[in-house]
A protein has these predicted regions:
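Membrane-embedded helix bundles of polyisoprenyl
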Residues: 11-20, 101-117, 122-136, 150-169
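Soluble catalytic regions of membrane-associated enzymes that act on cell-envelope
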Residues: 278-462, 475-500, 506
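Transmembrane helices and adjacent periplasmic/lumenal helix-loop junctions
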Residues: 119-122, 140-182, 197-207
């Protein structure tokens, strides 16, 4: 191969890195948290002794660094570029065609498209790279029988280290031997597919795969409980088709030369760039990218960025859920609730489906609101369902919640676990200052306030139930003065659900007990006006601001004056769009 192919690959890799950084930077930050890599011999051996374990270990080793901004996109671009160069080298050795070498980017692009599916395991990319490594060694051996021996050993090595990619190696080796046109020897090479068949049957019988077909395909590298998309098969299929074309149909004894090569390379490069762009546009999980961005801001405490990204119309309850938490963390839920497009009470309480992702979100919510027991339970449940051995984000939460409860032995167990992670070692080490030190916990701005919200009941009682109202009532009942966030969540839930009786009951229970309700927030006063619209004598009891009362009177007058006017919502939005009255009348 000439320098042009390597130059094209480097430029393609740079372009890919820029594209991934611009479009998918938060995707890589999101997928990292679902697997906590531990740099220990026990952890490595636990993975290596399983079929495909070494490739899985390598993938987790790489993916852990996705936790750093900008790193994930460039690491992925590097892996895809490496796979393209390796594929191109093998195709060139098969065909002696410089043009066909460029098409090594086709299976590489297919790998990229597969990796943009959250449920695809990057073990598949590492397995493909290991296949290329063994395939290059295989074709470098000149002696036929020695090469066949190396091939059989490579099959066994790939099965143990990389999983089902051994089947791809067996077919490639057979195609390679057929392409050499060495008479009867090529039929001896059929030994490779036969050995692969026996290995696959063994995998199936030993329950490594659920189906016999899965023992010979990349199905192994997809979430075991979900049906894979067809794109996960494209890389293998493309490489085998190109191998047949290069090794059997267009094979040359000498490298191609001349002007036609330049033309072929140029056309191939343009087609491959187009194919890559089409693949990214088609298979990228574009619908989830905004959520992943908001989730990253939530995880890192960048609350104002969540607010900025949620201006205007919202249609996704997950966005609303994250926005509500951001407002709560900034103590703005009681002031800015109706400045944003919350559709109804479902925006505050997504149902728990026992999945890793939803458990993580609910753990964050309950931690914010001060129900530490439920935050811990959701973290534990989510971690049990993690794609990897552990979820880094949820292990952090388990450390925090056990410190709050004073369960220092359990907290230290999780700290020791996380200290074995190269990425999270420093954070875990910083938590040791709280071990066996109640004063340090109580003085910490994150842990201390949540310890103050612990009720006197047992952990089992606190952890029972996952409904929002009883869950948020726990910290409010335990310490009303410090449970402002939980109180505001409850009040917001009642207002959004139009449950005025519960809203008034909540206010009556605490308005004379806590200092921060000495003057009711504007939206609470608006709610009181709605609840006691026909009982103005009640208004004085809640010390309603006369300006708010006058605004409500004007709102009613304009509504009555424009009855039947289809443009009424637009007419009133500018003046009353952030009021509870506007929400009641025009939200659907």
């Amino acid at each position: 191969m000439k320098t042009r192919f390597f130059l094209f690959s480097i430029l393609m890799g740079i372009g890919l890195g820029i594209t991934l950084q611009i479009a998918f930077s938060y995707y890589f930050l999101y997928i990292e948290q679902s697997q906590l890599f531990l740099l220990t011999t026990d952890y490595a051996w636990g993975l290596w002794r399983e079929a495909g374990g070494f490739a899985l270990w390598l993938s987790e080793l790489v993916v852990q660094y996705f936790a750093y901004p900008h790193v994930g996109a460039w690491l992925m671009a590097g892996l895809i570029t490496l796979s393209a160069i390796g594929s191109g080298f093998l195709l060139y050795r098969l065909s002696h065609s410089r043009v066909l070498a460029y098409w090594g980017w086709l299976p590489a692009c297919a790998l990229l498209c597969a990796s943009l599916d959250f449920n695809y395991n990057y073990q598949g990319i590492m397995a493909y790279l290991l296949f290329l490594f063994f395939a290059i060694i295989y074709i470098s051996v000149r002696d036929f029988y020695f090469r066949i021996g190396i091939g059989v050993l490579s099959l066994l090595a790939l099965l143990g280290s990389s999983g089902t990619v051994y089947a791809l190696f067996a077919l490639f080796a057979w195609i390679y031997e057929i392409s050499r046109k060495e008479g009867r020897r090529k039929w001896v090479a059929a030994l490779m597919p036969l050995v692969a068949l026996m290995l696959g049957y063994y995998l199936y019988l030993d329950c490594w795969t659920e189906t016999l077909g899965g023992a010979f395909s990349p199905r192994m590298y997809y979430h075991p409980k979900l049906d894979p998309k067809g794109v996960i098969y494209y890389a293998w299929g493309a490489f085998l088709v190109l191998s047949v074309i290069g090794g059997i149909l267009v094979r040359r004894e000498n490298p191609d030369k001349g002007k036609r090569v330049w033309i072929g390379e140029t056309i191939s490069a343009l087609l491959l760039i187009g194919a890559g762009a089409w693949g990214i546009c088609t298979y990228g999980d574009w619908k989830s990218l905004r959520f992943m961005e908001l989730d990253y801001y939530s995880r890192t405490g960048q609350w104002t960025k969540i607010e900025e990204n949620c201006e205007g119309k919202l249609t996704n309850y997950l966005y609303m859920f994250l926005l509500a938490r951001a407002l709560s963390e900034e103590e703005k839920l009681a002031t800015d609730l109706f400045r944003y497009n919350f559709r109804d009470e479902k925006a505050l309480a997504i149902p728990w489906n026992k999945s890793e992702n939803i458990s993580t979100l609910l753990s964050d919510l309950y931690f914010t609101c001060g129900n530490t027991a439920l935050a811990q339970r959701m973290a534990f449940e989510g971690n049990m369902g993690a794609r990897g051995k552990n979820n880094a984000r949820l292990i952090q939460r388990l450390i925090q919640t056990n410190l709050i409860f004073g369960e220092y032995i359990v907290a230290e167990k999780y700290i020791r676990l996380m200290e074995k992670s190269p990425v999270y070692h420093n954070w875990a080490k910083s938590q040791r200052v709280f071990l066996q030190d109640d004063k340090a916990v109580e003085q910490d701005p994150v842990l201390g306030v949540r310890r103050a919200l612990l009720p006197p009941d047992s952990v089992e009682v606190m952890a029972s139930g996952t409904e929002l109202i009883p869950a948020l009532s726990v910290p409010v009942l335990a310490n009303p003065e410090k449970a402002k966030v939980a109180f505001e969540y409850l009040a917001a839930y009642y207002l959004l659900s139009r449950d005025m009786n519960s809203f008034i009951a909540l206010l009556n229970s605490y308005k004379d007990e806590v200092s921060w309700l000495a003057e009711l927030p504007v939206i609470y006063q608006e709610g009181v006006l709605v609840a006691f619209e026909n009982r103005p004598e009640k208004w004085k009891e809640y010390a309603l601001n006369p300006d708010i009362v006058n605004s409500y009177v004007d709102f009613r007058k304009q509504v009555l004056a424009n009855r039947g006017n289809s443009g009424l919502p637009g007419l009133l939005r500018r003046t009353y769009g952030d009021t509870y009255w506007f929400y009641l009348m025009f939200s659907k």
